[in-house]
Amino acid sequence: YISLIDEVVIRALHPKVNPYRRDISKVNNFGKFGYFLEHLNIVLGSYQRIAGNKYIELNKKISNHLLRMSMSYSNYHADLLPNANMKWSADQAAIIYSLWLFDQNNSTNLSKEISDNWLQYMNDNCVHKSTGLYQTEVMGTKKYSKQPRGCSMAYLIHYMSRFNPQEAQKQWTLFKKHMM
């Protein structure tokens, strides 16, 4: 498995794949590329779990950046792309999962506060009235933003089941009731 996860990291870091178009270890400001960074952070956390600490400094740097971005907004959703106002609940769940994975690997506690704040925000502001499911997008930029969508909910529940299994189970029960 080590050679496989190593190849995944190499491909994810490649300048033709990463949005910075250069060696990511030389990037000083990760900017508003939360969508790429959330997935890279999960890959790096998975690498550490399987193969060791080769990328731990990059994993830590990205984790801290994602945490800062997430905590800087009252809706606790990081920016996902530089020129897009949309903030997807499922992607924020993936960001929090990536922080939780870093915590699991390194005996840290980066994910606790953002997880608690995000869940509180979601429960207070983003519950679809007729289903109880979380809304798809929190900025209201699309006509379907307030509506739960199947693919988005499945993704959100999958990641949330790691950092808050009880809340994920509630959403899963509602998902099966209203989406299946």
Feature names for model-found ranges:
Residues 2-22, 57-78, 109, 113-133, ...:
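Long, well-ordered core segments of solenoidal/helical folds
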Residues 85-180:
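Extended ligand-binding clefts on enzyme/binding-domain cores
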Residues 28-39, 54-57, 109-113, 147, ...:
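Residues within HEAT/ARM-like alpha-solenoid scaffolds
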Residues 21-26, 78-84, 134-141:
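Short linear capping/connector segments at secondary-structure termini
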Residues 45-53, 68-75, 104:
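Alpha-helix capping at helix-to-loop junctions
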Residues 30-44, 73, 80-93, 99:
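Aromatic-lined, polymer-binding surfaces characteristic
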Residues 1-52:
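Post-signal peptide N-terminal segment of secreted/secretory-pathway proteins
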Residues 37-40, 44, 59, 63, ...:
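Hydrophobic core/packing positions within alpha-helical solenoid repeats
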